[in-house]
Swiss-Prot record:
Keywords, alphabetical: Coiled coil
Name assigned to this protein: Uncharacterized protein ML1638
UniProt feature coiled coil, ranges: 89-140
Lineage, opening ranks: Bacteria, Bacillati, Actinomycetota, Actinomycetes, Mycobacteriales
Stored Pfam families: CT398_CC (PF24481)
Length: 232
């Protein structure tokens, strides 16, 4: 079982570091970045649309005042004093309207740039999504191949577990369920599962007269396989 555990651990490590997995994760990060950029452009467009609405409303108000004063000036029904008051006011409305129209043209130019950027981001996201789906399919194929390699080892493990005494099978299965190695060959002063160094005090607690005791390393919890020479 220790040998099977080692092999299954190598297979799991391979699954975690597949080039197909790295490619998929990279594309996923790029897709997330593209989504963030899209949201930023959409927010900027909303702000620009608000500016356009306000400018157009103010321009319309200036135009109405300009039209009103023009009618009065052209009506001939105003006296000299009214005429002298209306002419500067009329010029003020014209200058203000012209200034607002210049601002509106600048904002509309900015809006066009943002709209082009939005179109580009949407196209990029569509391409990224297609690539991401393809990368996911490639990764799933790689996972399936690894599962196929690991299945015989897992099946053999199940057979061996069924033959173990509960004192061994219970802690072994509990450790495996947590993602760790359940058993390992003690290698010198190192845990056979996690490869951590075991202190001399802990090693000295393993005595020759406890042949039937299940020896576990406290840090990893893994069952330790001991060579006969360990007790000599």
């Amino acid at each position: 079982m220790s040998k099977l555990d080692d092999e299954l651990s190598r297979i799991a490590h391979r699954a975690n570091y597949l080039p197909q997995r790295e490619a998929y994760e990279r594309m996923r990060v790029e897709r997330t970045g593209a989504n963030d950029r899209l949201v930023a452009v959409q927010i900027a467009l909303e702000d620009v649309d608000t500016q356009v609405f306000l400018l157009e409303s103010e321009i319309d108000a200036m135009r109405q005042r300009e039209d009103r004063d023009r009618l009065l000036l052209n009506s001939g029904a105003t006296d000299a004093k009214q005429l002298s008051d209306l002419q500067p006011e009329f010029g003020t409305w014209q200058r203000r309207k012209n200034s607002l129209e210049d601002s509106l043209r600048e904002v509309m130019k900015r809006r066009g740039e943002l709209q082009d950027q939005l179109t580009a981001e949407l196209g990029a996201i569509e391409r990224m999504q297609t690539d991401l789906v393809g990368a996911r399919q490639t990764l799933d194929v790689a996972f399936a191949e690894i599962d196929q390699v690991g299945q015989p080892h897992s099946s053999q493990c199940d057979v061996l577990i069924a033959e173990l005494a509960p004192a061994l099978s219970a802690p072994y299965e509990r450790l495996c369920a947590g993602g760790g190695l359940g058993v390992g060959q003690l290698q010198g002063h190192r845990c056979g599962a996690c490869r951590s160094e075991i202190g001399r005090g802990e090693l000295s607690c393993i005595s020759v007269d406890v042949d039937d005791e299940v020896v576990k390393y406290p840090e990893s919890g893994a069952i330790q396989l001991l060579d006969k020479g360990f007790f000599q």
